[in-house]
């Protein structure tokens, strides 16, 4: 009937609004983006809450992620299945956390997951080495990498255990004025 959307029920849209930083228009825009990634897989009608997983290989081709050296890690951090495949809910969560309105604490939680390559709930020297390799496209020599990693741990490791727990990480990014402006993507 007319221009009334039939992708989601009103209750679904209300629920998305309640648990994200988006309005109804944003949710519909996100669905359109999700649909564009895999039109043969993603239904236009979500009123019966279908569970559809779009593969990471398609998600990382989005313009917002394509050039990001952490694109796979970002997608994995939001993937319920742990393989990087995203449901629509995962996709909305990713955009919600990475939107400008999301609070620093929420962004910090996901940033920590992204940099914790070995998923041991710490950012250790090996995690920092992998981070540096991605940021510098492996252009630093081994001595430079060791120096940078040692310096980061020396300055950010508040409890002296040789690795960064979440509290150490949160304290470190609180001192980074550009964290909020760089840890986001737009719809």
UniProtKB/Swiss-Prot annotation:
Record-listed Ca(2+) 1 binding positions: 116, 118, 120, 127
InterPro entries linked to this entry: CIBP (IPR051433), EF-hand-dom_pair (IPR011992), EF_Hand_1_Ca_BS (IPR018247), EF_hand_dom (IPR002048)
**Is this entry keyworded Phosphoprotein?**
no
Q: Can you give the residue ranges of the EF-hand domain?
A: 66-101, 103-138, 144-179
Q: Which GO terms describe its cellular component?
A: cell periphery; cuticular plate; cytoplasm; cytosol; muscle tendon junction; neuromuscular junction; photoreceptor inner segment; photoreceptor outer segment
Give the domain of life: Eukaryota
GO biological process terms on file: calcium ion homeostasis; cellular response to ATP; photoreceptor cell maintenance; positive regulation of cytosolic calcium ion concentration
**Single GO MF annotation:** calcium ion binding
Could you tell me where this protein is found in the cell? Cytoplasm; Cell projection, Stereocilium; Photoreceptor inner segment; Cell projection, Cilium, Photoreceptor outer segment
Is Cytoplasm found in the keyword set? yes
The UniProt entry lists the main location of this chain as: cytoplasm
Q: How does it assemble?
A: Monomer. Homodimer. Interacts with WHRN and MYO7A. Interacts with ITGA2B (via C-terminus cytoplasmic tail region); the interactions are stabilized/increased in a calcium and magnesium-dependent manner. Interacts with ITGA7 (via C-terminus cytoplasmic tail region); the interactions are stabilized/increased in a calcium and magnesium-dependent manner. Interacts with TMC1. Interacts with TMC2.
Q: What other note does the entry give for this protein? A: The binding of either calcium or magnesium significantly increases the structural stability of the protein in comparison to apo-CIB (calcium- and magnesium-free form).
What this protein is reported to do is described as:
Calcium- and integrin-binding protein that plays a role in intracellular calcium homeostasis. Acts as an auxiliary subunit of the sensory mechanoelectrical transduction (MET) channel in hair cells. Essential for mechanoelectrical transduction (MET) currents in auditory hair cells and thereby required for hearing. Regulates the function of hair cell mechanotransduction by controlling the distribution of transmembrane channel-like proteins TMC1 and TMC2, and by regulating the function of the MET channels in hair cells.
Q: What protein is this chain from?
A: Calcium and integrin-binding family member 2
- Species lineage: Eukaryota, Metazoa, Chordata, Craniata, Vertebrata
**Gene expressing this chain:** Cib2
């Amino acid at each position: 009937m007319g221009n009334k959307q039939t992708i989601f029920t009103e209750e679904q849209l209300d629920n998305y609004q309640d648990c994200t930083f988006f309005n109804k228009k944003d949710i519909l825009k996100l669905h359109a983006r999700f649909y564009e990634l895999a039109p043969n897989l993603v239904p236009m009608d979500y009123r019966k809450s279908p569970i559809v997983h779009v593969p990471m290989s398609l998600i990382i081709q989005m313009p917002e992620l394509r050039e990001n050296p952490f694109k796979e890690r970002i997608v994995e951090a939001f993937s319920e299945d742990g393989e990087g495949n995203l449901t629509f809910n995962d996709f909305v969560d990713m955009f919600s956390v990475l939107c400008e309105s999301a609070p620093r604490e929420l962004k910090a939680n996901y940033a920590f997951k992204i940099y914790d390559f070995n998923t041991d709930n710490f950012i250790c020297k090996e995690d920092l080495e992998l981070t540096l390799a991605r940021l510098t496209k492996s252009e630093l020599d081994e001595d430079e990498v060791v120096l940078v990693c040692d310096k980061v741990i020396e300055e950010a490791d508040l409890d002296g255990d040789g690795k960064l727990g979440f509290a150490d990480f949160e304290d470190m990014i609180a001192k980074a004025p550009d964290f909020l402006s760089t840890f986001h993507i737009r719809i």
